[in-house]
Amino acid sequence: IVRADLNELRAKILELGRDNILCVLSTTSCFAPRARDDVETIATICKEANIGHVINNAYGLIDSKCCHAVNQACRVGRVDAFVQSTDKNLMVPVGGAIVAGPNKKFITRIGENYPGRASMSPILDLFITLLSLGKDGWKQKLKERARNVPVLVESLRQVAEKYGKRVLETSKGNNISIAVTCDGVEDPTELGSWLFKRSVS
């Protein structure tokens, strides 16, 4: 499994010095075979070094393990902000993000940096979607996703085996995406274009 090297992070902080580092950017949600970073330990390192820490939680709202990791990071160390995508998590069109964090003043200051010029569409789309789903509807969607992920993995495994490929085992550190080997494919970019033409993303 591929993830951030914590020893390298510590060494780089010592090499550069905290005054030369704006922040550390970690991630909970990424494409397999990369796994979720150990955001709890990174938060502890950032707290000890007094360096800002931003978590890319792009897909994380739909995965309870990612949410738990972010909550723990906020509790045990330093997290200045975490950012989530509305389209990836909340079934709305592309273009919106939720910036949150444990320090309300800091998040308010972020919001004040771009007053009045952003489009209202992402906020309105999100508001309408959440109102129509309601709390119970949202929880039901999360349960459906949790039930469907193992089914998708098993179905992909069967298709992969049929064509002499395999699904990479990344579920211990990545519940967001699934990777299939493409060894033997002469031009992987051509495979990407085939998938794109068939609306597979």
Label for each model-derived stretch:
Residues 79, 151-201:
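Conserved C-terminal alpha-helix-loop-beta "cap" of PLP-dependent enzymes
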Residues 1-158:
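Conserved PLP-enzyme active-site core in the AAT-like
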